[in-house]
Amino acid sequence: MTQTVHFQGNPVSVAGKLPQIGDKAKDFTLVAKDLSDVALSSFAGKRKVLNIFPSIDTGVCAASVRKFNQLAGELENTVVLCISSDLPFAQSRFCGAEGLSNVITLSTLRGADFKQAYGVAITEGPLAGLTARAVVVLDGQDNVIYSELVNEITTEPNYDAALAALK
């Protein structure tokens, strides 16, 4: 399945299907900042916010990580996973420089299948190969309780709606 989002107003195709409310989240294995493999199942029993974005080295993506880091400190039994195509070194450098410790960064470095499975694989245009901007919120049993594929990649996600799903 292919969906369309926009980058600076221009349409770009995104492969796969974003999980929808009521779906069971597919397990995945991504790469942590220490280069270890981390699976969704590593966070069993916890609620999860998947903040998915193209690159931590862009202003909007960096802003989303900062915002979710701030919000994560207020959430009980919840982990915020910030997922991008960046190398784990870049993710670690950014969070270290910014003093961000409430989120967990994960890279698609060895988990390219995640992009297709979660419907965020940008397949054309200048961002081809990166992940589209999306937020998926899971309950403690990995059921999707909120899902947003951001239409314009250069805008931030709807933080309030994502948080409302956790209330």
Swiss-Prot record:
Coiled coil: none annotated. Homodimer. It catalyses: a hydroperoxide + [thioredoxin]-dithiol = an alcohol + [thioredoxin]-disulfide + H2O. Residues 19-167 form the Thioredoxin domain. The keyword Oxidoreductase applies. PANTHER family: THIOL PEROXIDASE. Thiol-specific peroxidase that catalyzes the reduction of hydrogen peroxide and organic hydroperoxides to water and alcohols, respectively. Plays a role in cell protection against oxidative stress by detoxifying peroxides. This is Thiol peroxidase. It comes from Yersinia pestis. One of its GO terms (molecular function) is thioredoxin peroxidase activity. Belongs to the peroxiredoxin family. Tpx subfamily. The active site is a conserved redox-active cysteine residue, the peroxidatic cysteine (C(P)), which makes the nucleophilic attack on the peroxide substrate. The peroxide oxidizes the C(P)-SH to cysteine sulfenic acid (C(P)-SOH), which then reacts with another cysteine residue, the resolving cysteine (C(R)), to form a disulfide bridge. The disulfide is subsequently reduced by an appropriate electron donor to complete the catalytic cycle. In this atypical 2-Cys peroxiredoxin, C(R) is present in the same subunit to form an intramolecular disulfide. The active site is at 61 (cysteine sulfenic acid (-soh) intermediate). The lineage of its organism: Bacteria, Pseudomonadati, Pseudomonadota, Gammaproteobacteria, Enterobacterales. Disulfide bonds join 61-95.
